[in-house]
């Protein structure tokens, strides 16, 4: 998905006769987008998802509940964009973010490594706003306002790998790592 975003941005979204932003602005864009990934992953995976896992336990149902609920909360957090973007676009972003948040929780639970999701999140944010950051042509509010019903495909794109990561055969990996933190 990161490659798809970057390809789409660079090949399909490049403005005709576009002028690159100054290097300082491009660097600011890259750091800003990366830091969104850092902040959101620490809040939603390291604090919220882990707390939910501690509450629900490491049974198969507990892990799934923690992943799904943390994903829904992550999606709901994007409702704040209603202040600057079109309502339907924000709704689509919330659905997209909820399914992505569920996948990121599964990755975090399987690897026990928050930096994996921090990197993926930052790379997705950068790749999705690449043209706006390089050429100054699109704001986050504009991008969100442009989201349409095709974003619903993300539910499948992210929940299928979530199911693969949390399949019954691999659940012992989650339990092995997290037993030291979860008492249930």
Specify the residue positions occupied by each region the protein language model found:
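Aromatic-anchored segments of alpha-helical transmembrane domains
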Residues: 1-7, 71-80, 122-132
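Membrane-interface helix caps and helix-loop-helix hairpins in membrane proteins
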Residues: 10-19, 32-33, 80-88, 141
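Helix-boundary and loop/linker segments of multi-pass membrane transporters
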Residues: 16-26, 56-61
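Hydrophobic alpha-helical transmembrane segments
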Residues: 26-27, 64-69, 91-95, 115-119, ...
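Active-site His/Glu-centered metal-binding helix of metallohydrolases
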Residues: 38-43, 47-48, 52, 76, ...
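Membrane-interface helix/loop boundary segments of multi-pass membrane proteins
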Residues: 39-69, 106-113
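Functionally important transmembrane alpha-helices
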Residues: 89-147
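C-terminal membrane module of polytopic membrane proteins
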Residues: 122-184
């Amino acid at each position: 998905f990161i490659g798809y975003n970057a390809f789409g941005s660079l090949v399909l979204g490049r403005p005709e006769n576009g002028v690159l932003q100054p290097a300082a602005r491009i660097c600011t864009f890259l750091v800003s987008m990366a830091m969104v990934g850092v902040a959101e992953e620490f809040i939603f995976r390291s604090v919220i998802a882990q707390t939910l896992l501690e509450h629900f336990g490491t049974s198969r149902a507990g892990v799934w509940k923690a992943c799904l609920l943390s994903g829904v909360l992550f999606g709901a957090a994007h409702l704040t964009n209603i202040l600057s973007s079109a309502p339907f676009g924000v709704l689509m972003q919330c659905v997209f973010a909820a399914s992505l948040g569920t996948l990121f929780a599964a990755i975090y639970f399987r690897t026990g490594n928050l930096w994996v999701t921090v990197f993926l999140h930052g790379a997705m944010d950068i790749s999705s706003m690449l043209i706006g950051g390089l050429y100054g042509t699109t704001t986050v509010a504009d991008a969100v306002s442009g989201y349409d019903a095709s974003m619903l495909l993300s539910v499948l794109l992210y929940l299928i790998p979530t199911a693969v990561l949390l399949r019954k055969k691999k659940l012992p990996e989650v339990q092995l790592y997290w037993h030291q933190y979860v008492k249930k």
